[in-house]
Each structure stands twice: as structure tokens, then as C-alpha cells.
């Protein structure tokens, strides 16, 4: 009976955690990311043997005084939020000077929470960056050394992704403050969303100056534009 279940929203309780609600197809299906019990640093979710009923019970504690009467669970899973990043996106060892022959992209390079769809966004950016360079080299339009730029460019963005997601995860799992609940202070999740709007929208990608990218010293609009 939660009135906004068909709207994307974050439900924050004072003590029981948070739920992220994402409406899906059909007019009645929706996805819920439910925060479960806190784990010890040396503990994994698999050790606790959580069940579907545990998730539903946690959701009802968080959503109270509203209730969640589950008719059918299409799919469910338990996961730990793990932030990790690869050392490089190709097979060139540190200190070796040659063109790469093997490349990795997407989740093989960076892992994080599933919030905000960043895994898909950044993975597509990885493969687009690599794809156009491979085409140019294979068609003889560019020197194979062009492929060296892939790892450097995407590693920088992957680090930004993991750092941003770590902040997101901490904010979303933190209990709400009294000031947030009584409306005298803007919720931290709203501030985080505003601060990272361009990044989560995929429009904040910025590569360092190289032979592919000029410096931004002359990028301002001309007078009158």
C-alpha cells in the first residue's frame, strides 16, 4: 500500500536501512533493492544464508507504517557491495614498451554496486572507446600504437566510477538524520545526486590531454554564442 511504488524512489527509515524502488514493466512489477543486516568486515552475505522471506521481512520493517504484501517474486538475489578495479585494461606489463594485444572491458575491470546503472553506462563507454580504435587500426587508417591509449583513458574513468559509487553506497546505507526527517536539512542522497548528476548521466567523461585530445584552454564559447 505504499502510494509511490510506481515511481522511482528511495525509502529511508530511521533505524532499519533503505529500499530503492524501481518500477518495471506490466504496470505492477517493480524491483526493490533492500538493505539487509550489517555485516562484519570479515563476513560475507553468503555466510548468513538469507532467504526470500528475510528480504520481505526487512522490506516491511523499512517501509513501515506501509506494508508490502508480496504476491510473486520473479527473481531475487543477495549480493555484497564490493568495490574493486583492475591495474590495467590491456596485457602490457608495467615498464614494457609495446602495443597491446589483449584487452579487457566492463565488469572484468571494475566492480561496484548496481545503483544508478553505472555498470552498464561505463562498460559501454569502455567498449566504444576500444571499438573505434580497433576499427581504425584493422582498416589501416591508424597506427597500432593508437591502441595504447585505451587502457590509460578508461582506467582514469574507472577510478572515478568506483570512487563515486563508494560515496553513493555510504550515503544510501547511512541512517537519516533528524534534520533530514523533519525537513530542515536537504537529504544527503539529494545532495549526492545533484553533485554527481553529470557523471551518472554519462556526460562528465574527461580524458587527459594527449595527441588525441587537445587542451581545454580555448574551449569557451565565442562572444554572443
Question: Residues of each region from the PLM?
Answer:
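Conserved FAD-binding catalytic core of PHBH/FMO-like flavoproteins
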Residues: 1-81, 85
Amino acid at each position: 500500500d505504499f502510494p509511490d511504488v510506481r515511481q522511482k524512489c528511495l525509502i529511508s527509515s530511521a533505524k532499519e536501512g533503505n529500499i530503492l524502488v524501481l518500477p518495471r514493466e506490466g504496470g505492477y512489477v517493480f524491483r526493490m533493492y533492500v538493505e539487509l543486516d550489517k555485516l562484519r568486515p570479515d563476513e560475507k552475505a553468503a555466510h548468513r544464508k538469507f532467504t526470500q522471506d528475510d528480504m520481505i521481512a526487512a522490506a516491511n520493517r523499512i517501509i513501515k507504517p506501509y506494508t508490502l504484501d508480496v504476491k510473486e517474486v520473479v527473481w531475487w538475489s543477495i549480493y555484497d557491495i564490493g568495490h574493486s578495479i583492475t591495474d590495467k585494461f590491456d596485457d602490457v606489463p608495467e615498464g614494457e614498451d609495446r602495443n597491446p594485444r589483449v584487452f579487457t572491458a566492463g565488469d572484468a575491470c571494475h566492480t561496484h554496486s548496481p545503483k544508478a546503472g553505472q555498470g552498464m553506462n561505463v562498460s559501454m563507454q569502455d567498449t566504444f572507446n576500444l571499438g573505434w580504435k580497433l576499427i581504425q587500426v584493422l582498416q589501416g587508417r591508424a597506427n597500432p600504437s593508437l591502441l595504447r591509449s585505451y587502457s590509460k583513458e578508461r582506467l582514469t574513468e574507472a577510478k572515478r566510477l568506483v570512487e563515486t559509487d563508494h560515496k553513493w553506497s555510504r550515503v544510501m546505507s547511512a541512517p537519516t538524520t533528524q534534520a533530514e526527517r523533519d525537513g530542515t536539512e536537504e537529504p544527503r542522497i539529494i545532495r549526492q545526486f545533484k553533485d554527481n548528476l553529470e557523471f551518472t548521466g554519462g556526460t562528465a567523461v574527461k580524458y587527459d590531454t594527449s595527441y588525441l585530445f587537445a587542451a581545454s584552454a580555448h574551449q569557451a564559447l565565442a562572444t554572443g554564442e
